[in-house]
Amino acid sequence: MNEMKHPLNLERKKLLLASASPRRKNLLAALDVDFDVRVLPDIDETFPDSLPASEAAEYISNKKASAYQHLLAADDILITADTTVVLGTLVLGKPVDDADARHMLRMLSGCVHQVITGVTIATTHSRRSFSVITDVAFKTLSDEEIDYYVDTYHPLDKAGAYGIQEWIGHIGVTSIRGSYFNVVGLPVQRIYEELRKIINC
């Protein structure tokens, strides 16, 4: 019996994920595709004050792609991503310390916010960028719950100071609208569709 071919025909392509995030690595691996991980040098993840909050993640993912695109070989496909949490007009990145993490969670408590992941997919001759937005609602979190989460999970590597797949997501998130995986760190359904477009060009 012949082995079924994967719907994404990447046999002549080399997929590269430019991210040190274990969550993004696991999500991309769930697409059943082979890829290599490239860790980018330190990238300036600031963005212009004039840029709307909803565009920050895509802007930063583009900066990451620019730092690596010149190193690509002809058959390489590079994926870069950045995730931001947006509350109103305020962008919440990764907290600088535990106190900052507690402050962010108090801001998100009892509110609906947006998780926006900007993705750039680049080859030697093309680049396409997009953003995926998910609305997330938190219940009103107690100080005890916030303190327990920060002290136990140390979410300093997560935008908005939380991981939806962790304890705080299980007890605190009341609803989401949009892609769950986008909140975890990578909108894999949209990435799959974009890769199909590139392969079929």
For each predicted feature, which ranges?
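Surface-exposed, flexible loop/turn segments at secondary-structure boundaries
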Residues: 23, 43, 127
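A short coil-to-beta-strand element that immediately follows conserved catalytic motifs
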Residues: 35-36, 78
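Anionic-ligand binding patches
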Residues: 2-6, 11-15, 49-201
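General structural signal for secondary-structure boundaries
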Residues: 33, 39, 140-142
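Short glycine/proline-centered loop/turn elements that form peptide/ligand docking sites
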Residues: 2-4, 22, 39-41
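N-terminal beta1-alpha1 ligand-phosphate binding loop
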Residues: 5-33
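A short beta-strand-loop structural module common to alpha/beta enzyme folds
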Residues: 36-46
